[in-house]
Amino acid sequence: MNYKLTKKEATELIANKLSHFFGVSPEEATYEHYYKAVALILRDMMMQGRKEFHNEAKKADSKKIYYLCMEFLMGRSLKNNLYNLNLTKTMESAPKGFGIKLEKLYDCEPDAGLGNGGLGRLAACYLDGLASQGYFAKGYSILYEYGIFKQKLVDGWQTELPDFWLPGGDVWLVPHEEEAVDINFEGWVDESWDNQYHHVELRDCNTVKAVPYDMYVSGKDGKGISVLRLWSAKAPGLDMDMFNQGDYMRAMEQNAMAEVISKVLYPSDNHPEGKSLRLRQQYFLVSASVQDIINNHLRIYGTVENLADKIAMHINDTHPTLVIPELMRILLDDCGYGWDEAWKIVTDTVAYTNHTVMAEALECWPEDLFRRLLPRIYEITKEIDNRFRSFVWNSTGDAGKVERMAIVSNGVIRMANMSVAGSHCVNGVSALHSEILKKSVFKDFYSVTPDKFTNVTNGIAHRRWLCQSNPELTKLLTELIGNGFVYDGSKLEKFKAYADDAQVLKSLEEIKLRNKEKLAALVKKSNGIDLDPNSIFDVQVKRLHEYKRQHLNAFHILSKYLAIKENPDGDFTPHTYIFAAKAAPGYFMAKKIISFICSLAELINNDPDVRGRLKVVYLEDYNVTLAENLMPAADISEQISLSGTEASGTGNMKLMINGAVTLGTMDGANVEIHEAVGDDNIIIFGMSTDEVNDLKRVGYNPMNYYQNNADIRKVVDFINGGINGKVFPEIGGTITHHDPYMVLADFADYKSAQAKAEALFADRDTWNRMSLMNIAGAGRFACDRAINEYARDIWHTKPLRK
């Protein structure tokens, strides 16, 4: 596919789209019209590119990769696709003839409301990597009408508003109503035998129609085009009998209940209705996707005997685990396979990535809910459990192990156990995480099937997070080491040769300052707060969760504030702390931490005693676009989770590749960042995973730390006295006896690490060299590397285009 366009061709195409789709001339068109016109041009080009890519795959009979995830945090598509297809300059000049600036078109596009945190952003990065490396791949998720939510901070308290992203975002979507499939819930299972053939039908079920919409994702230079297929839930039709009998509300209510499935990502599950909706969402995604995959496969081959040879199905975390019993259902009920044959096809086809060691994230569903909502899937799951129990017993003779590894136990369905049992490969997402899976989380499984476990450390789309987000740094790198790093992140290693070049270090410092000035202007506009670009920009941006320990950061900030108040004439390095994070709607403690940080910010930012020394800002509604402005401006990357709780992290990689220095624990991918940059270019603090486990074993008593550390006492006592008239008993009042993530245990070491960071920052040459070494060491965290490892070790395939 030739993606080249001249300025004249682009101008004509824009005018054509404006006329045909919106009925306006270039003179009448708004910026919104121009944005959509350019998006439609790109969408059409990528659609054609995908068609050619598909024909090549068909001709080569290459293996197809299907990647299922509950969320894909795509961000904006216009800038990314223009960059990848090398059309940025053309589309800068073409609209200019109409008096239109491309930068303003970028701002017309909303972030696609299809994801929440690191899991979804990783999935989005992998679609980019798959396309850029030339693999034929398709992602599957749900078309969430209102996204996750828009975060609004009202007096410091997170309030959730619907994210109306589709009016501006649906221009990238191509509907395929002709490929819609039916998804069945509830009902009862009717089984019969006919000449040794087992007939199974679900009777009196509630049917929802899944309608697919395709979004295209370009690889660099258009080498490949990935597709993200998004399913929208539609009612099968209006019950006209009910409507004609005057029961209008009930007729409409049936439709609304069907379509609520694709309204919002991760509805609160603090109540039975929320749990039921989440399970419906998961089965809706899985059933629609598996039906689609099998339909496509049968169209090409006419059999599923060769399924595992021709496709790889990858489940990203436990949300799509129902792929396993759903594929079994199709093979048993629709294709007539016997159990053993079907199970071999499933386990040879499916692979699973685990993303957490947190117990609450290893999903379990109440057995009665599962049975009522998915009766046939429940039957199959029970049979999987029975046979797997027999397998474990025959392998080990250990009744305790059988029970721990069971899929159905104590009234719940354990999704993580089903994922491991039904996959041919299970991987963690950092070296440390994969070891924890083997030694702790899935210890029993590892003892029975050790060959099933492997590691693929996460990666990021470095072309987005470096080349697009930080054009000045990209320009400097290209001038010094060539543009090879754009295609192969490992080439960033060459930048190490300039670690002692004073002019290069000076240039790095100047680029960082300009990025900080840009962020300061954005914060002034959004928050009305003045930031000092010459201060340390200390950044913690990620999902709000207790294990990520945003409150440890806040405790230290409060400690510093109290120190300044005690000694206002002391020598303090100007320090700006930047937070951005959303809390899950039903996660009260996370919301309380946000409120605490906002109250702290209000206290500090309005106190003349600390003016010019300390500033705290909480940026609301954190998303990909905000992150693209934050990452290049950060000096310090806060990665301070309790060791042994973070699977990997990818924010640490995005900050690293933009020259931020990691201040963190030896957790997740921090371990590999430390390995990449060495002791001198990272600031490590806190207990190791082994030390955390040892402390838990002997009994962790946070009160000891409170009693023996004056700084901790001052901080906790101050919190308990209230901040700006607000009290935080859940934070200050409980932490001395309930501190599950050991904030007080790591506090003293964290404070020392912060002091070390300030001293290093004051030595500009040393700090700039540290920054350079982080950029040069970040290449190993490119998603291209991760994708090639998945392809080699798990999917067993090679790129279609090299």
List where the protein language model places each region.
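A conserved ligand/cofactor-binding region detector
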Residues: 1-802
